[in-house]
Amino acid sequence: MVDSGTEARARGKAEAGLQDGISGPAAARVNGKTQAKAVAEAELKTESVTQAKAGDGAMTRTHTVTYREAMAVTREVIKVEDTTKTRVMVQTKTKPLAERSIVPQTKSRAMPISRVSTVTKSEVKVVAVIEANIKSYAKSHDKANTGSRPDRREEASIGMKSSDEDEENICSWFWTGEEPSVGSWFWPEEETSLQVYKPLPKIQEKPKPTHKPTLTIKQTVIAWSRARYIVLVPVEGGEQSFPPEGNWTLVETLIETPLGIRPLTKIPPYHGPYYQTLAEIKKQIRQREKYGPNPKACHCKSRGFSLEPKEFDKLVALLKLTKDPFIHEIATMIMGISPAYPFTQDIIHDVGITVMIENLVSNPNVKEHPRALSMVDDSSESSEGPKSGESYIHQVCKGILSCPMNSPVQLAGLKLLGHLSVKFEDHYVITSYIPDFLTLLNKGSVKTKFYVLKVFSCLSKNHANTRELISAKVLSSLVAPFNKNESKANILNIIEIFENINFQVKTKAKLFTKEKFTKSELISIFQEAKQFGQKLQDLAEHSDPEVRDKVIRLILKL
């Protein structure tokens, strides 16, 4: 009760002093400090009594309340001093130096309290500072301002010391010891030398293979110009005969690879003969039958024909009945020993392997076999090169016409003639046989028509042959197979022939003159052209897109 009365009286005095006004700066400071001391004494006494009764748990709560009240009152006193100071500055511009020193001392009292309020970690030290302040305020309650200055200085020094220690404690929360350098955040404290980047050693690349000079066609032909000798002989050797029994072997000095055609079997050019028994060939055929045509596990040579073991036995039995080299040549092609050319593969596949050999063995017309064999050899660009003379072309054409219709030999001759007709200088010989070829075109099979149309296609590219190709007979023979029932390959060949003829006619308009064409010929040509135009319109709706596209382009060109 006494404490509360004292506090009330102090507050009353402060209010009265503020209302009445302060006559001088010294009186205002003394009254303000006296009021602050009185309030602080009353509050701090209350705090000390509460600490004695409550204990550690209550100390923290009373500290918090006491600090807030003291700070609030101190701030009010500071405001009063500031207003008083401004009034004094207006009234008088000069004031003693002794009076100036009082204001910072009052501020110094507030500084420890404010710092103590911010630091919550050092409660023990704060209690000591507060007890010292209470004692100093109690002793100097009735004393003059000069007597309280040393205590205030001691209090300020204590507050500054405690604040420095508290700052050190706060710093210890974040780091300890000496302050590390920035570089230690990224690497150890020990200074390490900068590492120079060294590129990885390059892997030694294999030296690039030297470019081999490509041989010309002439040099390649000379390189392969070696003689070839293939025959089936018994293992025991002796005379070159074909006994009915015995283990036969293939003997060959070299396998010649024709220019431009890759052989089905690659046999290196050994110095000695190459031996392969029929039993080994039969074993390879059985492996191929077991593993498939191109297996990875099969070690047999690649073949162009699928020959079953039964067919192989039958083929061997047929070979024992004849000594014809042409039949043995075909047998080596079927076995995959000798290279089979594309057109011979087609012929053998179409006719049948054993059927062909059987027909050749039983065929009484033995004279055409060597001729067909010579055609096969000549078409493969041997060491002497293709025979391109006039007499040779006559011989080939006569051989084609003398063979039976649609026979394999005739097909081989037609394909050979297609290769020979590439050169324009030999066309005048071939054009003399056009009427005979038209007969093959009208009566032949699909393959016979195909090879005849190939020959006509080569002839249509030459301007000198246009006169013969646009005759009534040729046009009617070309238009006849031009329908939807014909094979796609033949239709495309006929379109190509008419495209070439159309180009020659448009570039050379002098073809239609009285000296070269009669009136009847021109009428027949126009009639055939009209019929051809109607068939073109029908083929424009062909099911095959390639044929349909070619027909539409030809219509636009015409």
UniProtKB/Swiss-Prot annotation:
Biased composition annotated in UniProt, kind: Basic and acidic residues: 1-14, 139-156
Sequence ranges of the ARM repeats: 300-339, 422-461, 463-503, 520-558
Keywords tagged on the record: Repeat
Region listing for Disordered, in residue ranges: 1-34, 139-163
Highest taxon in the source lineage: Eukaryota
A Pfam family matched in the record: Arm_2
Family: Belongs to the eutherian X-chromosome-specific Armcx family.
Protein name, UniProt field: Armadillo repeat-containing X-linked protein 5
Organism: Pongo abelii (Sumatran orangutan)
